[in-house]
């Protein structure tokens, strides 16, 4: 029996974790980048995105979540970005991702326009934990139920905005809502994956949302599965 085309082309989510290289080129290409990102959202190819900020308040990269039918299609979106075309990036990691937990209200409240000019800012601060796991799959499986329960508790308390594993199960993205970086980092450090040594490494950065398409942020599986 032939598999339906609609099934074959079911969209997938891809994280693009970007680090800036040449800041002068970033500045020169920023307007074109904003326009490109707006177009992707309008076409249903960009779920959410915005700059990553370090502890000193410097914008050092980007975190985008694309929706595409294949990795090749998602890679095309990366390569056509004006920042990429301007050779302004130091690095990027494009990884297929599964969305397990989401708080759309938080994400919408955190959203701010990329060209906002009225000086206002969102009262919601988000912090992204971009994690890599150790290879021990048996340990990962043993700790996962406690990790899920912990994430559900954070989501219920309004402290978790996004959560889910990489498709290859070698890492995950966890986005926390907190007034301060220290508070958000404490949520990551209290995760059973952190306590039990599942996390091999992580990067932890504030994430400023500059555009969101809530219709694309549907769960790939339930928080309890």
Across the structure, where does each feature detected by a protein language model lie?
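Conserved, structured core segments of small domains
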Residues: 2-225
